[in-house]
Amino acid sequence: MATLFTATVPSHHRFVSPSQHPKQSLLSQSLSVTFTENPQPTAVVTLQEQQLTDWITSPVTRRFGIGAGFTWAGFLAFGVVSEQMKKSRLDVFQEEDNTRGLEKQEEIILPNGIRYYDLQVGSGATPSSGYLVVFDVKGQVHGTEQVFVDTFGGKGKSLAMVMDSRPYSKGLCQGIEHVLRSMKAGGKRRVIIPPSLGFGDRNVEFGQGLEIPPSATLDYIIEVDTVYCFQTIV
């Protein structure tokens, strides 16, 4: 099942990949977990593994709430995700200094039909498969004023999504994930997504009168706030 949950994230947080935590010595060691199909009574996690799990879970819990923290604890404890934080760290203030807005927006057309305009170029990490991305998004049907999702300006909570985790929700689609792969933390982009990478020929209803008609072209504004980088344990 996909992992998509809402998050309230301070605007100054851009890239999180800590290296100076008291538990940092644990990050260079492999995570070995014993589990079965029924993990509750049989899963075994050593004290050292529990410390590593707590270290990753704590900041996620603070940013995304208890449920998200439990989700990551479950990933680590039960082998759903066998990953750990990278040890490198990019200073937040330096990253924000290097983020720059663009006076002139150039249209980029991708082979798959996606068009986008960079409004602000970020200087942080670029999300990859399995990475946790926190971003704000506004989506509407192209050529109309019909907005179906908007988390900017306190209108809603920022979204947090694990890359390559489906199905999508909250008005997101395959085209959004494709675009995120070439963005950096701090970046902002307007994206126009064709129906083939949106919701296709389906009529999608979100409740409260919000819906996307069949074969709709979608117009999004995306701003990447934070990228949590994880390094696969081999």
Curated annotation (Swiss-Prot):
Keywords: Chloroplast, Isomerase, Plastid, Rotamase, Thylakoid, Transit peptide. Coiled coil: none annotated. It catalyses: [protein]-peptidylproline (omega=180) = [protein]-peptidylproline (omega=0). It is an enzyme of class 5 (isomerase). InterPro entries: Chloro_FKBP-type_PPIase, PPIase_dom_sf, PPIase_FKBP_dom. Residues 130-228 form the PPIase FKBP-type domain. GO terms for molecular function: peptidyl-prolyl cis-trans isomerase activity. Residues 1-28 form a transit peptide. Pfam families: FKBP_C. One of its GO terms (cellular component) is chloroplast thylakoid lumen. Its EC number is 5.2.1.8. The keyword Iron-sulfur does not apply. It comes from the Eukaryota. It is found in: Plastid, Chloroplast thylakoid lumen. Gene3D superfamilies: 3.10.50.40. Belongs to the FKBP-type PPIase family. PPIases accelerate the folding of proteins. It catalyzes the cis-trans isomerization of proline imidic peptide bonds in oligopeptides. This is Peptidyl-prolyl cis-trans isomerase FKBP17-3, chloroplastic. It comes from Arabidopsis thaliana.
